[in-house]
């Protein structure tokens, strides 16, 4: 009947779900299944759910509560109830996870279909109302998914994404901003939303690129959304339109070169982004940071409304968010020198507002004078391509530190020390000293690295590695072909 019955496979579209997952996994494609907590009246598993007392109740507790749902009235699993969680977990394991996927996508988990604020929740046997407990359901739905993933795939790192969450959701799931409107205003709102979530403790956040309600995005809007989106902690072009069509980048042929360049930047920056995720997991620092978080002594940063932000502590990002823009107004925080990453690292003194010319290819980004950024050209497919060569971009006007973090990307062996954590300490001065201290038992796939040190005032006289002078090359091709050495790029 073409209705949405969660956990029930459409055998016309997916005659062999397990075989489908096996084939996708063999191709290196992670498939994530969209799950919603509402149960329609004709759901094939409704009797089993009823027998296990899995639903939210009416205010007097005499029966199951029915509310608005996709395709008609539905009941809603009570995630404050041990029975509700266990029943959901059993269905999730049998019909989804054991078929071959290791990921869970919890949608509509804000429980807006339960409109009666007095509807009754179990709350571990203590009873309570939706008015009191609604905010807990999304977290407990993610918690239940995490338990299920651990039970089906012990030793594997769980990946869960939630549309909603309360304080603490970052312990269980990545989140996104829900169904957003397709317009230029939303692009700006999305940046503010991610920044706000980050300083609220939820760093692993993103928004649907291209919009999820409204007409198909115009080509310039989609491009600017992607150019910003590739730097979001969660990057996903998940765009649908009111005419029931979807948005894909290859539909915008004129913009494809710029879209490819943006995607490529995301992959180049994965070592830096992954390290920022690690940092966030340790001390809660967001990946996207409002200017005032990095520059609390600069009053201008508190009032800046230009949607400029820091990506980690090293890179200032000023995405182009105005239709037809020819320039981008950017405030560069005081106390630092800033290097334009798209203009041969042209330096700018901090504490000033600049007007930067932009075109469709522009993704304005500035390197801070204490920056340490790890990048690579190796990765085109995250699950297949090993990291062989690492580029480390350093601006050493002042002392700085950075932790480059790496592990296998999927298991929980990092909890037992199977990781590679390299502390990079830069001491600025007439002689710039860069110290690497490695920790952990992970056998890194990195075989070589290039340190790119920005020096606009004067070139290096010599370079040494462990007190051994390295050979200087005059011709770049000779330097690139050598096992070691240094080269000054004029």
Where are these predicted regions, by residue range?
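Surface-exposed loop/edge segments in extracytoplasmic proteins
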Residues: 339, 345-348, 460-462, 468-473
């Amino acid at each position: 009947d073409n209705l949405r019955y969660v956990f029930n496979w459409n055998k016309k579209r997916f005659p062999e779900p397990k075989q489908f997952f096996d084939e996708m996994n063999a191709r290196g494609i992670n498939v994530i299944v969209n799950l919603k907590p509402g149960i329609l009246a004709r759901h094939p598993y409704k009797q089993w759910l009823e027998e296990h007392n899995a639903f939210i109740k009416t205010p007097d507790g005499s029966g199951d509560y029915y509310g608005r749902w996709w395709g008609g009235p539905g009941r809603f699993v009570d995630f404050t109830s041990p029975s509700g969680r266990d029943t959901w977990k059993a269905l999730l394991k049998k019909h989804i996870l054991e078929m071959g996927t290791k990921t869970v996508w919890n949608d509509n988990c804000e429980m807006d279909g339960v409109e009666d604020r007095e509807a009754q929740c179990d709350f571990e046997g203590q009873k309570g109302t939706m008015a009191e407990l609604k905010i807990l359901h999304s977290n407990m739905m993610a918690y239940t998914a995490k338990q299920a993933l651990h039970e089906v795939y012990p030793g594997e790192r769980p990946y869960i994404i939630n549309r909603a969450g309360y304080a603490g959701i970052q312990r269980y799931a990545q989140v996104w901003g829900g169904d957003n409107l397709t317009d230029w205003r939303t692009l700006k709102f999305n940046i503010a939303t991610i920044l706000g979530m980050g300083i609220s403790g939820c760093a692993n956040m993103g928004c649907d690129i291209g919009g999820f309600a409204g007409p198909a995005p115009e080509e310039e809007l989609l491009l600017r959304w992607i150019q910003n989106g590739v730097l979001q902690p969660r990057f996903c072009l998940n765009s649908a339109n009111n005419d029931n069509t979807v948005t894909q980048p290859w539909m915008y042929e004129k913009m494809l070169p710029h879209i490819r360049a943006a995607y490529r930047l995301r992959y180049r920056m994965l070592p830096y982004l992954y390290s920022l995720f690690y940092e966030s997991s340790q001390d809660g620092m967001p990946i996207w940071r409002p200017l005032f978080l990095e520059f609390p002594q600069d009053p201008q940063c508190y009032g800046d409304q230009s949607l400029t932000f820091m990506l980690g502590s090293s890179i200032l990002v000023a995405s182009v968010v105005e239709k037809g823009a020819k320039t981008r107004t950017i405030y560069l925080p005081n106390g630092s020198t800033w290097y334009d990453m798209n203009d041969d690292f042209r330096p700018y003194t901090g504490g000033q507002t600049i007007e930067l010319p932009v075109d469709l290819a522009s993704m304005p980004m500035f390197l801070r004078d204490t920056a340490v950024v790890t990048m690579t050209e190796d990765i085109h497919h995250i699950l297949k391509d090993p990291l062989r060569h690492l580029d480390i971009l350093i601006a050493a006007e002042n002392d700085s530190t950075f932790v480059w973090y790496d592990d296998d990307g999927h298991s929980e062996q990092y909890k037992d020390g199977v990781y590679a954590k390299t502390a990079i300490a830069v001491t600025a001065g007439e002689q710039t000293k860069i110290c690497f201290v490695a920790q952990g038992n992970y056998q890194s796939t990195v075989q070589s690295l290039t340190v790119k040190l920005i020096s606009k005032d004067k070139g290096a006289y010599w370079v040494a590695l462990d007190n051994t002078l390295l050979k200087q090359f005059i011709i770049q091709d000779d330097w690139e072909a050598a096992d070691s050495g240094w080269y000054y790029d004029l």
